[in-house]
Amino acid sequence: YDVAGHKEAAKRGLPKLRDSVSAFPVMTDKKNVDVFKKFKVLSKTEVASREHIFVEKYIKQVTIEAETAALMARTLILPAAIRQQTELSEAVAATEAADVSTSTIRTQLEQHVELVNKFNEAIEALEAAGEAHHEDVHKHAKHIRDHVLPAMNELRDLADALEARISADLWPLPSYREM
C-alpha cells in the first residue's frame, strides 16, 4: 500500500502488520476469537488450530523456496559463473601471450571473481540460515522472516548481478529478457 493507505489504516485504528509472521498471532487475539465464537463460526480451539496450521504452512513453503534457491544457485548458476571465470582467465592469458595490455579484461576478471566469491558465500549463508530449527513454530517463523528471507534476497540480488555478467550461451536459466 502507499503512504495514504497506511495513514488511513492508522486513522481507523487498524493494526500495522508488515508481514505474515506478524499477522498470524492476531488471529488468536481475544477480540477476534470472540467474534468467531459469537457467530458460531469457530471455537477458540479451532481458531488456534488454524493459526498454527497457517504458521506451519508458511514455514514449509518458505523452507522449500529457500532450499530450491540454494540448490539452483549451487548446481546451475555457480557452475556457469565458474565457466565464465575460466573463459575470462583464458582471455587474460591469451592477451598477455600476445603482449597486449590486459588491464580491461583483468579488471573484468577481478570483478567477476569477487562477485562469484560473494555469491558462494551467500549460498552458504542461506544454507546455514535454513538449518536452524526451533521447536516453537512462532520462533521458527520469526527466524525464517528475519534470517532466511533476507539471505534469499541477498542471493537473488547476486544472482541477478551474475546474470548481467555471464555470457548468454553459458547462462543456464531463462533470462528476464527471454521471459
Give residue ranges: language-model regions.
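C-terminal amphipathic alpha-helical interaction region
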Residues: Y1-M179
